Amino acid sequence: MGVVAGTGADISLLPRDPIVRRFVSRGRLVAIPARLSKRRLVLDWLAQEFEPGQVYPEAVVNRMLGRFHPDFAALRRYLVDEGFMERRQGFYWRAGGTFDV
């Protein structure tokens, strides 16, 4: 795995999932869903911003997630807690979620 310092994969501004679309306007999250099932769908959409096999410093993860919502720390924590990303010593990498092939 290589460490990257840039931005991510540029996920679509309009999510495919109709539930996720309810929480997104102009490519940004208008709210973080409280219901776990809906939050997982949103997290899956966000996880696609991160390239599989790449390692990201925390500052880059913060910047990438900050493009979607001001509470990037909560999003980062949720991504790790729900298994979409893993973390070790300030570095993050994608560990799950939907992959486009």
Name what the model sees in each region.
Residues 1, 91-101:
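Short, cationic-aromatic polyanion-contact patches
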Residues 13-50:
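Short alpha-helical segments that sit at the start of domains
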